Amino acid sequence: MPNAAASPRYVNNGDGTLTDLQTCLMWEMKTGTVGSPVDCSTTTCSNPHDVNNLYHWCSGFPNCTNASNPPDGGAFTDFLQRVNGQLCATGTCPDLGGYSDWRVPTLAELQTIVDFTQGVCGGGSGPCINPAFGPTQADNHWSASTNAGTPAQAWLVNFNFGGASSNNKALVAYVRAVRGGF
């Protein structure tokens, strides 16, 4: 019988996606080289997979303070439309991995990819995530989860130390798309 410990948790699908065999979630892999952040609300970010792209959770007040308003910031509009092949100038839009049901992960889903044996968390340097995910900014990444106690805030995971916190939805953070569910 094969050694279960030797089985990989993550499978690179060869199409810019990674499947987590433990949770059955499929994740977007980022591209490029970690560098200076790019605020996609002030410039066009045509490559949604660029590791340096920052997005807003909501477009601003009053949407950010009303829990009943749907998320309408660049993370949920421009980013997801591009990942899902819905926003392009040519009319032939590639969707990621052949799927068009990508979304921003919940807090619980995003926390599943924090790896406390990697990067700063493991005593080294870099982000606390398995290198199989490709380049990752060691900073805050949005989840789709609103802070129930403070509706103007949403939950983020910081891959510099692996922790979660909530912050103002009008701020910018990084985003990694996911599909499926557990």
Residue ranges of predicted features:
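Glycine-aromatic-enriched surface loops/turns that form tight recognition elements
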Residues: 1-103, 107-182
